[in-house]
């Protein structure tokens, strides 16, 4: 699944408006590969789905 980050740009972790690939969904949270730090879990409300 591809999602677009709709939150604030966060210290080079995630960039507002950028699309990210969801590696897995865990208890409603998305595991995405960040811009700099590897992959982490983030709450789904911070993203909008671009492609399922």
Give the positions of each predicted feature.
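Basic/aromatic-rich interaction segments and small domains that mediate binding to polyanionic partners
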Residues: 2-46
């Amino acid at each position: 699944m591809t999602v677009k980050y709709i939150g604030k740009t966060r210290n080079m972790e995630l960039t507002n408006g950028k699309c990210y690939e969801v590696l897995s969904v865990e208890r409603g949270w998305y595991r995405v590969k960040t811009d700099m730090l590897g992959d982490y879990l983030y709450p789904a409300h911070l993203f909008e789905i671009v492609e399922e």
